[in-house]
Amino acid sequence: MNIHEYQGKEIFRSMGVAVPEGRVAFTAEEAVEKAKEFNSDVYVVKAQIHAGGRGKAGGVKIAKSLSEVETYAKELLGKTLVTHQTGPEGKEIKRLYIEEGCAIQKEYYVGFVIDRATDQVTLMASEEGGTEIEEVAAKTPEKIFKETIDPVIGLSPFQARRIAFNINIPKESVNKAAKFLLALYNVFIEKDCSIVEINPLVTTADGDVLVLDAKINFDDNALFRHKDVVELRDLEEEDPKEIEASKHDLSYIALDGDIGCMVNGAGLAMATMDTINHFGGNPANFLDAGGSATREKVTEAFKIILGDENVKGIFVNIFGGIMKCDVIAEGIVEAVKEVDLTLPLVVRLEGTNVELGKKILKDSGLAIEPAATMAEGAQKIVKLVKEA
């Protein structure tokens, strides 16, 4: 689950992580009123959308007067902002974050992530702040420093200080930086985050260490422990199909292709998309039906896939373990009838009750193309979509 920058900074502030003063605004008039509350001559007007790259896309403005705050607010509100993370359709700006300006001395990058290779939380940091960390990793990987954190001990003060020294935090600010990192780690753990990224972290002329921009993602599987976090969810920033999928316990992510996919298991789903790509097709989505799909769930999955007007064909790839192939087959037949499917449909079943499942599909009299393997199924759906 994602939240807005201003919401993340409120969490930081409440847990002892230093951030500049800021207020959220929904109108240009409100933006000016919020700016008046600051003891500053410089203000930062920031578009609030669930995507990075806002600065490069023109979504962050520096205002040196209240009149400029109003001008920038009017310019941004209602605008569709396109960044490298939004896709070409962009996202509409519906709210702004008005922040007090600060005298930046140097920008840095700091992030806490879960390292799948070590199964531990890793602190990453670089003195190349303000740019995409992927770009730094590609061009100057030697400028990225890491600390692997023992889950029993947590982030140690000496690790925080070592990172601060490695990224050349000024000596007079090292202790503040270490305290900052320890507080940030506490946010990561206490709020069950999957990522906490500060880019940039800044030191100021006054020797302070502050969050200038932040990204927080939460582990969806832990949200039941954080009702306060769930309340921060902005459904207007999410794909309606993804929202509908979550209601039916389906994992759905929209992509920009034209072949809809319904699979059980995240690993098989990714392998299916890779296979479609290998044979020259483009997946329209990632959809994991999970291990306990019912007929109703399969029907809802079809409806969600067909909610994407770009879909020109569907590939169902199911391995029946807990999920029995005959139940899936019955669900597919019912779904095809209910949604009155006219698009090409290829189904590959394997596992428990597979022969019974195949018989149900064959006896249905519907235009369902069977496939014996994932590769065969991918080839068939790519061919059918191209011929359609």
Swiss-Prot record:
Mg(2+) binds at residues 199, 213. Substrate binds at residues 264, 321-323. Residues 9-244 form the ATP-grasp domain. It catalyses: succinate + ATP + CoA = succinyl-CoA + ADP + phosphate; GTP + succinate + CoA = succinyl-CoA + GDP + phosphate. InterPro entries: ATP-grasp (IPR011761), ATP-grasp_succ-CoA_synth-type (IPR013650), ATP_grasp_subdomain_1 (IPR013815), Succ-CoA_synthase_bsu_CS (IPR017866), SUCC_ACL_C (IPR005811), Succ_CoA_ligase-like_bsu (IPR005809), Succinyl-CoA_synth-like (IPR016102). Pathway: Carbohydrate metabolism; tricarboxylic acid cycle; succinate from succinyl-CoA (ligase route): step 1/1. One of its GO terms (biological process) is tricarboxylic acid cycle. It comes from the Bacteria. The keyword Magnesium applies. Pfam families: ATP-grasp_2, Ligase_CoA. Binds 1 Mg(2+) ion per subunit. Heterotetramer of two alpha and two beta subunits. Succinyl-CoA synthetase functions in the citric acid cycle (TCA), coupling the hydrolysis of succinyl-CoA to the synthesis of either ATP or GTP and thus represents the only step of substrate-level phosphorylation in the TCA. The beta subunit provides nucleotide specificity of the enzyme and binds the substrate succinate, while the binding sites for coenzyme A and phosphate are found in the alpha subunit. This is Succinate--CoA ligase [ADP-forming] subunit beta. It comes from Staphylococcus aureus (strain bovine RF122 / ET3-1). The gene is sucC.
